[in-house]
Design a protein with these regions (language model features):
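Glycine-rich adenosine-cofactor-binding loop
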Residues: 22-32, 169-189
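NAD(P)-binding Rossmann-fold cofactor-contacting core
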Residues: 42-57, 192-212
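Short, Lys/Arg-enriched N-terminal segments with co-localized hydrophobic residues
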Residues: 1-12
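Glycine/serine-rich phosphate-binding loop and adjoining beta1-alpha1 elements at the start
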Residues: 14, 80-169, 298
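Rossmann-like adenosine-cofactor binding region
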Residues: 65-66, 83-87, 101-112, 209-284
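Residues in the short beta-alpha loop(s) of Rossmann-like NAD(P)-binding domains
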Residues: 28, 51, 121, 201-202, ...
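Rossmann-fold NAD(P)-binding glycine/threonine-rich loop
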Residues: 119-136, 258-302
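Glycine-rich, highly charged phosphate/nucleotide-binding loops
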Residues: 58-70, 92-101
Length: 308
């Protein structure tokens, strides 16, 4: 049975998560944290795709499979990394000395199993259907995206502090986009004393920007960013093209938080002498422990819904 902690710290049985056996295949330190937390909750966790150095950091009760075939045959929930693959062919396993092909994994996965993968694509969806496996992209879960925005925002602030010779307090900061990351980032910047402008397109977003006391700017009217010390882009489409970069001060730091292909023409920025940083996967880099907790929580939420 699983356990959860009450506010007073006592262990209390968690009856809502009915699946007690889970396998993790590959991943980084986020997965290691999630593995340990799920194991500590009283569940059986089997893993494959990690080297000995990383395995030694896992809970003693975790089942360390030598190969995919050695994963206990009664496990029906499999968790892949975020993202599940970097090339569409192999499972992302940075702590593994070999490779784990997606086809190899799916052939060994029992039909009607549940496969949780981060950033699942059309190829994985098609293969899962062929093998009769239920695929769920946990990166699309709202709770994960909202909670992940916190370490993303903090990681962006860390980058800004490292890459600028001045404090954030009193700095002119522009946040482009007012989605999950933009909302949390703008709030944290204001708390640090920055002068924050937020650009958005939707009238409702611009209304919220004003209501929270930020300077509002319609992204459609973004013609120059010369007055800003730091720009944080969260919009996953090309915003900072050649025309806008020509109207950007060379002392302005641009931090692109948007998923690929991103929102900055990096080649042009380099030619113009503008320092632009592509900051991807910040939760796993800056706060793997917290990011692992978020994955664990999301996995449990999905299991509760699937196995009611």
């Amino acid at each position: 049975k699983g356990y959860r902690r009450t506010q007073k710290g006592e262990a209390e049985m968690d009856e809502s998560v009915k699946i007690n056996k889970i396998a993790f295949i590959g991943g980084d330190m986020r997965q290691v944290r999630a593995i340990n937390r799920i194991s500590e909750s009283g569940r059986e966790v089997a893993v494959f795709g990690f080297n000995r150095d990383v395995i030694h950091k896992m809970d003693n009760s975790v089942v360390k499979a030598e190969n995919i075939a050695a994963i206990p045959s009664d496990i029906r929930v499999f968790v892949l990394p975020l993202p599940y693959s970097m090339d569409g062919e192999n499972i992302k396993a940075p702590f593994f000395d070999g490779t784990i092909t997606i086809s190899e994994l799916l052939r060994a996965t029992p039909p009607e199993s549940v496969l949780l993968a981060g950033r699942a694509d059309a190829r994985l969806e098609a293969l899962a259907e062929v093998y009769g496996i239920r695929l769920i992209d946990y990166f699309k879960r709202e709770e994960l995206m909202v909670l992940n925005a916190v370490p993303t925002a903090e990681g962006a602030i860390q980058l800004a502090l490292e890459e600028t010779p001045h404090t954030l307090c009193g700095s002119e900061c522009l946040v482009t986009g007012y989605g999950r990351i933009g909302k949390i980032l703008a709030h944290k910047l204001v708390l640090l004393g920055a002068n924050v402008t937020v650009s958005a397109r939707k009238p409702s977003d611009l209304a919220y920007v004003k209501a929270f006391g930020y300077n509002a700017l319609n992204t459609e009217n973004l013609r120059t960013v010369k007055r800003f010390d730091i720009v944080f882009n969260t919009i996953p489409k090309l915003i900072f093209d050649r025309e806008l970069l020509m109207n950007t001060d060379t002392n302005t730091l641009i931090i692109d938080l948007a998923s690929l292909p991103g929102g900055v023409d990096f080649d042009t920025a380099e030619k113009l002498g503008i320092y632009a940083v592509r900051a991807l996967s910040l939760p796993g880099k800056c706060a793997p422990k917290t990011a692992g907790e978020i994955i664990k929580t999301t996995v449990f939420d999905i299991i509760k819904e699937v196995y009611r």
